[in-house]
Regions:
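Terminal alpha-helical segments
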Residues: 1-135
Length: 135
């Protein structure tokens, strides 16, 4: 498959924003996490050391909660100079799990979703996609 991580990141962000506005917290939170993941993968997919046979290497095919610790800050500095500061600030997705998509309503708090939204917005900006690095 020809992955378009940049397009996917922007699409997930837009859909998450809409769902958030509709008070669909759990689904919005899932998409914020996927948008963040795709933003990072959009950058990593341009780093030769992160590729295998022209695609993102299996070591980087993780969800954002696990992918965070695999981001090669030194390798992405030229492509996404702002990403280093965002990554070094700590993993804001430690409490995000893709498996939460199976959970019932109310499992994701509004404050947790807001934190993931803010982190995703910063990542999108740092990766040169829509959103901004600021607040």
């Amino acid at each position: 498959m020809n992955e378009k991580y940049d397009e996917a990141a922007q699409r997930h962000w837009r859909d998450a924003e809409w769902l958030s506005g509709e008070q669909r917290t759990e689904n919005a939170d899932q998409l914020y996490g996927l948008a963040a993941e795709c933003a990072v993968k959009a950058v990593l997919s341009k780093v030769p050391g992160c590729l295998s046979d022209g695609e993102l290497a299996p070591a980087y095919r993780k969800h954002i909660d696990k992918l965070w610790s695999s981001i090669l800050v030194q390798g992405v500095t030229k492509l996404a100079p702002g990403l280093q500061a965002v990554v070094q600030a700590g993993n804001p997705f430690q409490d995000w799990r893709v498996e939460q998509r199976y959970a019932g309503d109310g499992v994701v708090s509004s404050s947790s979703m807001a934190s993931h939204r803010q982190a995703t917005k910063r990542l999108l900006g740092a990766c040169g996609l829509s959103g901004s690095r600021g607040t």
